[in-house]
From Swiss-Prot:
Tissue specificity comment: Expressed by the venom duct.
Keywords: Acetylcholine receptor inhibiting toxin, Amidation, Disulfide bond, Ion channel impairing toxin, Neurotoxin, Postsynaptic neurotoxin, Secreted, Toxin
Organism: Conus omaria (Omaria cone)
Subcellular location: Secreted
Stated role: Alpha-conotoxins act on postsynaptic membranes, they bind to the nicotinic acetylcholine receptors (nAChR) and thus inhibit them. This toxin blocks alpha-3-beta-2/CHRNA3-CHRNB2 (IC(50)=11 nM), alpha-7/CHRNA7 (IC(50)=27.1-59 nM (rat)/ 290 nM (human)), alpha-3-beta-4/CHRNA3-CHRNB4 (IC(50)=160 nM), and alpha-6/alpha-3-beta-2-beta-3 (CHRNA6/CHRNA3-CHRNB2-CHRNB3) (IC(50)=201 nM) nAChR. In the OmIA-AChBP complex, this toxin occupies all five binding pockets located between two adjacent subunits of the homopentamer.
A GO MF term: toxin activity
Family stated for the protein in its record: Belongs to the conotoxin A superfamily.
Protein name (database record): Alpha-conotoxin OmIA
GO-annotated cellular components: extracellular region; host cell postsynaptic membrane
Domain notes per entry: The cysteine framework is I (CC-C-C). Alpha4/7 pattern.
Amino acid sequence: GCCSHPACNVNNPHICG
């Protein structure tokens, strides 16, 4: 998912924590 991709994790802190 998104949180396994560093850039997506950075751009989605409300999803990934």
